[in-house]
Design a protein with these regions (language model features):
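Ser/Thr-rich, low-complexity intrinsically disordered terminal regions
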Residues: 36, 55-176
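N-terminal alpha-helical membrane-insertion module
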Residues: 1-63
Length: 176
């Protein structure tokens, strides 16, 4: 199945079912009883609306970020990338601390890398980012960059974690 179609279906169910259940619970609390018709209308209507709106905006933003072929990986809110850099561990840490896109994030030094926590913004509830040294390959260092939402149930991030990974990659790799 097409990854975009899978995402539409995933959002449809994960938004529609809870909304339908909450609306049914409200009816039960108000003494109106349970109605399958009302549950299905709430579930399908809200699920369809949220799926069409959120996934379409997500796809549009990813296209703006340069994604041309959609896969399960680049549609995911958990982004990872392996990057080769001439910077050693201490140089990489210094470079990230001085980068404008990352300087507002809380940085914690790990044994083989650095962990960053972004704050809550109007775009997200924050992200957890890791840049971990995997190995040394000749004169270069191989880093594993990962970015994921702080809120684990997030299903759409509008490309925020992809931007985080790309910003770190640009900061620690030489520009041609």
């Amino acid at each position: 199945m097409n990854p975009v179609t899978k995402l539409y279906i995933k959002v449809f169910f994960q938004a529609g079912i809870p909304f339908g259940l909450v609306m049914s619970a409200i009816d039960l609390i108000n003494g109106n009883g349970f109605s399958w018709e009302k549950f299905l209308f709430s579930f399908i209507g809200f699920g369809l609306f949220m799926s069409l709106a959120l996934v379409s905006i997500h796809i549009h933003r990813l296209k703006k970020l340069g994604v041309q072929k959609f896969t399960d990986e680049n549609l995911s809110v958990r982004q990872t990338k392996i990057v080769t850099s001439p910077l050693n561990l201490s140089e990489m840490k210094q470079k990230l601390k001085s980068d404008l896109a990352l300087e507002k994030m809380k940085m914690t030094e790990a044994q083989n890398g650095i962990l960053l926590d972004s704050k809550v913004t109007w775009k997200s509830w924050g992200e957890k980012i890791g840049v971990i040294l995997q190995c040394k390959d000749g004169g270069n260092y191989v880093y594993h960059i990962s970015s994921k939402p702080r809120l684990t149930r997030t299903i759409i991030d509008f490309g925020k974690n992809l931007v985080n990974v790309n910003n770190i990659e640009q900061a620690i790799t030489p520009h041609s």
